A protein has these predicted regions:
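Right-handed beta-helix
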Residues: 1-63
Length: 63
């Protein structure tokens, strides 16, 4: 049986998995891995902010 931990206290929801977690809807998905990778996939991705929209990393590649 799959081992998934869920903790909800009315303020926040925490879902934990040991190796990888995928949230999927149609062609869109968010994947979180144990190694710390976060993968966003979809036919259209939008990032919007009323304040600063910051991208930080060891290196950042656009296009």
């Amino acid at each position: 049986p799959a081992q998934v931990e869920v903790d909800a206290d009315g303020q926040r929801l925490i879902v934990s998995a040991k190796e990888q977690m995928v949230l999927r809807c149609g062609k869109a998905s968010i994947t979180l891995t144990k190694a710390g990778k976060v993968l966003l996939e979809g036919s259209y991705v939008l990032s919007r902010s009323t304040g600063v929209n910051r991208v930080k990393g060891g290196s950042v590649q656009l296009n």
